[in-house]
Each structure stands twice: as structure tokens, then as C-alpha cells.
């Protein structure tokens, strides 16, 4: 290279190196600062490197600076931390330039009450779009995958929190921005779903270290599948709703003809099957009954008439409450070892014992639908409870009395 050219080239190369070093230095500083923000907010319990790999984690990260959105175990459990990013803010056009995109949460059991589904709950997409029922995480882990994140549970032998012994702990990793550009086909991206599972598991194990728990969770499975779409015809019921297809209940025009189902997993603290009347069946039943019923609510939204069935297991089964729709009545307990119905709402419960642990099974009917359902609904509840208890090898099954059906306020 001629000497007259060599000098300018060297200068350009040096300038390029300086620019590259400056860019690298700035990116390194931003990464270090982002990690610090996550550690400060989440008490060092949530893996910062995994949060930083989530799709909306670009740009500048900050955290909610308040007692409600930061974790300090000295303040007791449960707690959560909330992380913001400018990338999420730019994508959604927020005035502040940033947006809350991630929540890490944790807690222990025993905890507060579990409340059965409300007869006025909205359990399917009210606009007629697909609903994605939660699914078991799998991989030998007690956990669920939701439409926004992952929740895991870990037994906590020998652990202690707030000066009291605990039986288990839980951790949740959740994405707060689940619309484009941070989604695929209306769901979390495959990448984010896997990262959230890793984050939840690591958070649970870190909390186990702090609390002195003996056990640890294994690594979560890779390539966690997207959630299935529902509801589906009752003729295709599988998993938690397979018993409904096998019993051919949908042949009756008074019973639901669609289901929201999940894969079965006997480890789960809450396993669910939802039976739904499709628009045509709900309208037909309403038209056939409206002249015979006072104040019958017309089902105008998809899935407004439903039967929701849950099984609560272990520690959560010890503190289940039957919902109180109108809020002016104290919710009634659904105690293990018993069975019955709410005196206020169309909610029933049964109980059993599985592997030495209590189980509480609940059934909620949508308001309006409870006015037209025949007493044969007891056969549906019995079939559901039988399926769960036989699958799990349960004993001491207690079911509501026949006189508890159909629902009539006491």
C-alpha cells in the first residue's frame, strides 16, 4: 500500500475501533445497569439474564420504585417485582416512553383462601375468539403454562418464612405485554415461553435457598408447546374433560356441547374442565324455557352459560371458599371431608383424599343456566369426581346429597 494511502486508512481503522469500543462500552453499561435494576427490584431472586432475553426487554430497563412492586423478604410473602422497558414503551406508544413488561412473583403455602369460580365469571373469549386453557408444564415439575406466563410449585420441607414453617412455595414469571410485536398467532412466542419457564423454575429454587427448603426443581422441559385453542366440540373432549365425552352427556340439548380442556397432571394444585353451551344450543334452550322462567337471563355472549369444574389439591384444598356473587354474604367454606352446595349461589363441592392429601372438587353453574338445568346435573358432577378420584387413586369420596340438586336457595 502506498505510504500516502496508508496513513488515512490507519486513521479510519482507529476511528472505527474507537466507535466500536464506544458502542460496546455503552451496550455493556446498559446491560450491567439493566441487571442491577432487575436485581434491585427482585431481591436477587429472579434470574436477571433470563429476563433480559425476553422479547420486550430491549432499550433501557427500570423497575417500579414502590413497596408494591419490589421484593424484600423481610416484609413477608407473597411479593412481586415489576420491570419496565423502553422497547415495550415504544412498541405500544406510551406517554412515558416505557412500559411494564415483566412480573416476577413468589409466595408460600399455607396461604390465603382459594375461591371457587363465580357464576358470573367470563371463562371464554367474550368476542368469539379462541380461548387458550392453561396446561401442565410437565417435565416432572408441578407447574402450569398460562397465556401470559408460567407458575411452578415446590415442596418446602424444613423451610420457614416469617418465622413460621411452610409446606410449599410457588413462583411465577409473567409477560405483561402479550400482543404484537411480542406474540405469535395470539400467544407467547416459543422463545419467551421457554424463557419464562426457566425464569420461574430458577426463581423457585433461589427462594428455596433463602427459606432453607430441602428440595429443588429440575430444569424445565424445552420447546414447551403453545396452548391449544378452545372451546372444542364435546365429541373431541380429551384430558381433563374426556369423561364428558365418554358419558355422552352432550346428547341432551340441555347439557353443554363444547369443552375447555387441559392435559391431565395429578400433581397440579388446580385441575379444571369447563363445559360450555355453544351459541346455538344456548339460544335454543333459552327460547324453550323463557316463558316458564321468571327473570331468565338471555345468554348473549359466547360461553355465558357454562359448567365449571375444579379439583383443588393438597394445601389449597384446606382453604377453599364457595363464591358469594353479590358480595354482601360471607363466602362459605368447602371443607375437606364434607360435601354440599352454597346456600347463595349455584356452586357445589365434594371431597376426597388422594395419597394422604385432601382434595376438594367444585362445580359452578352460570347464572341463568342454573334456572334451566335439570336435576340430572348431579350425574355430571358425579362423573367428574369419579374420573378424578379413580385416576388419582383417591379414597374417602364424599358427594353432595341428591336433595342438593337442582340448585334452590336455602
Regions found by a protein language model. Name each.
Residues 134-213, 316-410:
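A short, solvent-exposed beta-edge/loop patch
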Residues 2, 47, 77, 116, ...:
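Alpha-helix initiation/capping motif
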Residues 86-88, 109-111, 157-161, 174-180, ...:
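Generic structural motif
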Residues 2-27:
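Hydrophobic membrane-insertion alpha-helices, especially the h-region
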Residues 110-138:
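Long acidic/polar interaction regions in large eukaryotic complex-forming proteins
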Residues 27, 98, 168, 303, ...:
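Short, low-complexity intrinsically disordered segments
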Residues 25-117, 215-280, 284-293, 389-410:
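Extracytoplasmic low-complexity, Pro/Thr/Ser/Ala/Gly-rich segments
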Residues 261-349:
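Flexible, solvent-exposed loop/hinge segments that line or gate ligand/substrate-binding clefts
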Amino acid at each position: 500500500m502506498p505510504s500516502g494511502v496508508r496513513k488515512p486508512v490507519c486513521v479510519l481503522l482507529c476511528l472505527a475501533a474507537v466507535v466500536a469500543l464506544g458502542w460496546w462500552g455503552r451496550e455493556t453499561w446498559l446491560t450491567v445497569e439493566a441487571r442491577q435494576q432487575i436485581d434491585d427490584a427482585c431481591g436477587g431472586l429472579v434470574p436477571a439474564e433470563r429476563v433480559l432475553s425476553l422479547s420486550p426487554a430491549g432499550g433501557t430497563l427500570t423497575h417500579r420504585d414502590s413497596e408494591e412492586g419490589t421484593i424484600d423478604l423481610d416484609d413477608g410473602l407473597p411479593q412481586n417485582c415489576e420491570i419496565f422497558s423502553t422497547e415495550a414503551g415504544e412498541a405500544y406508544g406510551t406517554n412515558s416512553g416505557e412500559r411494564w413488561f415483566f412480573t416476577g412473583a413468589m409466595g408460600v403455602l399455607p396461604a390465603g383462601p382459594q375461591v371457587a369460580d363465580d357464576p358470573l365469571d367470563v371463562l371464554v373469549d367474550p368476542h368469539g375468539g379462541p380461548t387458550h386453557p392453561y396446561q401442565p408444564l410437565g417435565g416432572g415439575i408441578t407447574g402450569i403454562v398460562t397465556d401470559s406466563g408460567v407458575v411452578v410449585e415446590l415442596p418446602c420441607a424444613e423451610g420457614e418464612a416469617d418465622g413460621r414453617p411452610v409446606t410449599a412455595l410457588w413462583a411465577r414469571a409473567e409477560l405483561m405485554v402479550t400482543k404484537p410485536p411480542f406474540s405469535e398467532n395470539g400467544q407467547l412466542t416459543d422463545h419467551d415461553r421457554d424463557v419464562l419457564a426457566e425464569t420461574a423454575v430458577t426463581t423457585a429454587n433461589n427462594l428455596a435457598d433463602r427459606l432453607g427448603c430441602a428440595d429443588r426443581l429440575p430444569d424445565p422441559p424445552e420447546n414447551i408447546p403453545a396452548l391449544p385453542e378452545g372451546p372444542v366440540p364435546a365429541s373431541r373432549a380429551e384430558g381433563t374433560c374426556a369423561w364428558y365425552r365418554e358419558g355422552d352427556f352432550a346428547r341432551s340439548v340441555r347439557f353443554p356441547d363444547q369443552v375447555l380442556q387441559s392435559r391431565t397432571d395429578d400433581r397440579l394444585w388446580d385441575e379444571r374442565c369447563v363445559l360450555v353451551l355453544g351459541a346455538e344450543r344456548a339460544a335454543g334452550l333459552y327460547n324453550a324455557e323463557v316463558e316458564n322462567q321468571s327473570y331468565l337471563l338471555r345468554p348473549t355472549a359466547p360461553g355465558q352459560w357454562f359448567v365449571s369444574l375444579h379439583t383443588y389439591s393438597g394445601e389449597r384444598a384446606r382453604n377453599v371458599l364457595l363464591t358469594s356473587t353479590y358480595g354482601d354474604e360471607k363466602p362459605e367454606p368447602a371443607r375437606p371431608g364434607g360435601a354440599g352446595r352454597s346456600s347463595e349461589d349455584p356452586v357445589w363441592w365434594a371431597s376426597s383424599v388422594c395419597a394422604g392429601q385432601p382434595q376438594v372438587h367444585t362445580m359452578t353453574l352460570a347464572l341463568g343456566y342454573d334456572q334451566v338445568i335439570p336435576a340430572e346435573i348431579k350425574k355430571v358432577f358425579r362423573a367428574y369426581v369419579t374420573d378424578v378420584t379413580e385416576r388419582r387413586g383417591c379414597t374417602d369420596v364424599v358427594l353432595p346429597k341428591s336433595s342438593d340438586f337442582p340448585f334452590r336457595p336455602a
